[in-house]
Swiss-Prot record:
This is Conglutin beta 5. Residues 606-615 have a biased composition (Low complexity). Keywords: Allergen, Glycoprotein, Seed storage protein, Signal, Storage protein. Component of globulins complexes which accumulate in seeds. Residues 1-30 form the signal peptide. It comes from Lupinus angustifolius (Narrow-leaved blue lupine). The variability of the residues taking part of IgE-binding epitopes might be responsible of the difference in cross-reactivity among legumes. Belongs to the 7S seed storage protein family. Glycans are attached at residue 544. Residues 33-221, 384-439, 606-626 are annotated as: Disordered. Seed storage protein. Accumulates during seed development and is hydrolyzed after germination to provide a carbon and nitrogen source for the developing seedling. Residues 33-105, 136-174, 184-203, 389-417 have a biased composition (Basic and acidic residues).
Length: 637
């Protein structure tokens, strides 16, 4: 019994060990089957299937899964319980998928299309993401290629510039001392290039009007700029001469001013930072010049001229009842070249008083009174809330009229009471007016008259080195070609119409042999009242009058100027040439040249169309002689 008791526990223990071994073997065998199960590799193959292959339908997938399950059941009949659980789960999944498919079939057609489009967009985005790295690599390669190409080009450009610099240095070394002359020559070439461009612009003008506008020496009356204008008159200033062309740079400090006023009007007192030479071209005037110790008034008529120094206070009256007053002035600015300003002591609606520029304390100390009284008497009230009485007082003082105001008969009589007239004959005074036609003309015949006042004959214009000319050309007459040796003349057309021809020189540069070629250039324009014409020194000129023409001229740099005529019986420089020189320089013989010069028996002025008129008379004479014969023959036949 005791042995049985001992063996029974051992038997139980052995059975337990065997059971444990069997269980462990079964577990191991089950894991081995799980590892060897072909379902998972197939599922991985499904997951790793190439996305480019067309997707299979759900029915095909279910058939494949069912086929795999049948194989597993045949291969492993011992996995009944676990297989039943898995089959139940798969059945539930199939039902869910079947329900989802039924719901999708019940959705509208456009929803399915929308899903398909979304899937297509997702596929395109995925493809774009896959292609993006490749694009970036290509862009980097292109950038690297372009940068290398640009570096190569920049290197070539640097080498090219270096070679050009070396060539330039070699040329400079070879030329040596002539480099200074070449730099001057280059500047002159640039200057002449600008002139050539201007002249080409003039040649391009097809119409006469465009040609007039492109002529640098001609300024129409429309080129005046209005400084002030009201119902009583206007003040105009011509544009600067040097703005048109650099050939007139020596005239940059000279301006032409013109003012016109109605009858019985007064141009208010003022002074300017410019010297003036004024000339009356229409009507009558009374000018009053105010100095610190005295006041002088002069009566001016047509052709009278007067020097008005800079800083001199003056005012001009038009005393005539019918005629307008027209005055032309040559202004010579003092402070700034080409710019001048007028300073008025009184305030108007268009002009402030120079007293308004001072402070209140300065004005009170200057006039030794309160500022209110100074404002009431000199400055006027600028407050819009001034009372009616003050406003009426300002209207009576003509502050609302402007710079040119009307005056009464009584005021005109008082202003002219002590005025002096200009000197018609004898020696001109040092301060009073003088008339341009007071002396005999220097050139005169039946076709015209030429008056001139030179600096050595008049002390008023001597320090300014200015001369004045006044020319009268009859209708159909010609001022013969001539040129001035030193003076530059600014001509103002006072009255009439005509044509002028001015001869200049154009410089051209030949690039091959680097030589300058001078070509003759002709400038011409139609002249009318108010136009301005500039005649440079040394430039031949002729003027043809289509109606009675009157010209006023200001000569700049006029001291010792000489006028040289190119035709006519007197003062003809061509006539004074030696006979041998005439033989050399002209195509014709010396006898032919002298005979040609002697054909013109007039001097300075001549008939503008002598040959045409003579031919016309000859034709009329021949027609008159043939008249009776032709009438008889026509009667006979």
């Amino acid at each position: 019994m005791a042995k049985m008791r001992v063996r029974f526990p051992m038997l139980v223990l052995l059975l337990g060990v065997v059971f444990l071994l069997a269980v462990s073997i079964g577990i191991a065998y089950g894991e081995k089957d799980v590892i060897k199960n072909p379902e998972r590799p197939e599922e991985r193959q499904e997951e790793e299937r190439d996305p480019r292959q067309p997707p299979r339908s759900r029915q095909q997938e279910e058939q494949e899964r069912e086929h795999r399950r049948e194989k597993e059941r045949d291969r492993e009949p011992s996995r009944g319980r676990s297989e039943s659980k898995q089959s139940q789960e798969e059945e539930r999944e199939r039902r869910k998928e079947h329900d989802r498919e039924r719901e999708q079939e019940q959705q509208p057609q456009y929803g399915r299309r929308h899903e398909e489009e979304e899937k297509g967009e997702e596929e395109e985005e995925g493809q774009a993401r896959r292609q993006r790295p490749q694009r970036r690599r290509e862009e980097r390669e292109q950038e690297q290629g372009s940068s290398s190409e640009s570096r190569r080009q920049s290197g070539d450009e640097r080498r090219h510039r270096h070679e050009k610099r070396e060539q330039r240095e070699e040329r400079e070394q070879e030329q040596g001392s002539s480099s200074g002359r070449q730099s001057d020559y280059g500047r002159r070439q640039r200057h002449e290039g600008r002139e050539q461009r201007e002249e080409r612009e003039q040649e391009q003008g097809s119409s006469s009007e465009s040609h007039r506008l492109r002529n640098p020496y001609y300024f129409s009356s429309e080129r005046f700029q209005t400084r002030y204008k009201n119902k009583n008159g206007q003040i105009r200033v011509l544009e600067r001469f040097d703005q048109r062309t650099n050939r007139l740079e020596n005239l940059q400090n000279y301006r032409i001013v013109e003012f016109q006023s109605r009858p019985n009007t007064l141009i208010l007192p003022k002074h300017s930072d410019a010297d003036y030479i004024l000339v009356v071209l229409n009507g009558r005037a009374t000018i009053t010049i105010v100095n610190p110790d005295k006041r002088q008034a002069y009566n001016l008529e047509y052709g009278d001229a007067l020097r008005l120094p800079a800083g001199t206070t003056s005012y001009i009256l038009n005393p005539d009842d019918n005629q307008d007053l027209r005055v032309v002035k040559l202004a010579i600015p003092i402070n700034n070249p080409g710019k001048f300003y007028d300073f008025y002591p009184s305030r108007t609606k268009d002009q402030q008083s120079y007293f308004s520029g001072f402070s209140k304390n300065t004005l009170e100390a200057t006039f030794n009174t309160h500022y209110e009284e100074i404002q009431r008497i000199l400055l006027g009230y600028e407050d819009e809330q001034e009372d009616e009485e003050q406003r009426r007082e300002q209207e009576q003082s003509h502050q609302d009229e402007g710079v040119i105001v009307r005056v009464s008969k009584e005021q005109i009589q008082e202003l002219r009471k002590h005025a002096q007239s200009s000197s018609r004959k004898g020696k001109p005074s040092e301060s009073g007016p003088f008339n341009l036609r007071s002396n005999e003309p220097i050139y005169s015949n039946k076709f015209g008259n030429f008056y001139e006042i030179t600096p050595d004959r008049n002390p008023q214009v001597q320090d300014l080195d200015i001369s004045l000319i006044f020319t009268e050309i009859s209708e159909g007459a010609l001022l013969l070609p001539h040129y001035n040796s030193k003076a530059i003349f600014v001509i103002v057309v006072d009255e009439g119409e005509g044509n002028y021809e001015l001869v200049g020189i154009r410089n051209q540069q030949r690039q091959q042999d680097e030589q300058e070629v001078e070509e003759v250039r002709s400038y011409n324009a139609r002249l009318s009242e108010g136009d301005i014409l500039v005649i440079p020194a040394g430039h031949p000129l002729s003027i043809n009058a289509s109606s009675n023409l009157r010209l006023l001229g200001f000569g700049i740099n006029a001291d010792e100027n000489q006028r040289n005529f190119l035709a006519g019986s007197e003062d003809n420089v061509i006539r004074q040439l030696d006979r041998e020189v005439k033989e050399l320089i002209f195509p014709g013989s010396a006898e032919d040249v002298e005979r040609l010069i002697r054909n013109q028996q007039q001097s300075y002025f001549a008939n503008a169309q002598p040959q045409q008129q003579q031919q016309q008379r000859e034709k009329e004479g021949r027609r008159g002689r043939r008249g009776p014969i032709s009438s008889i023959l026509s009667a006979l036949y």
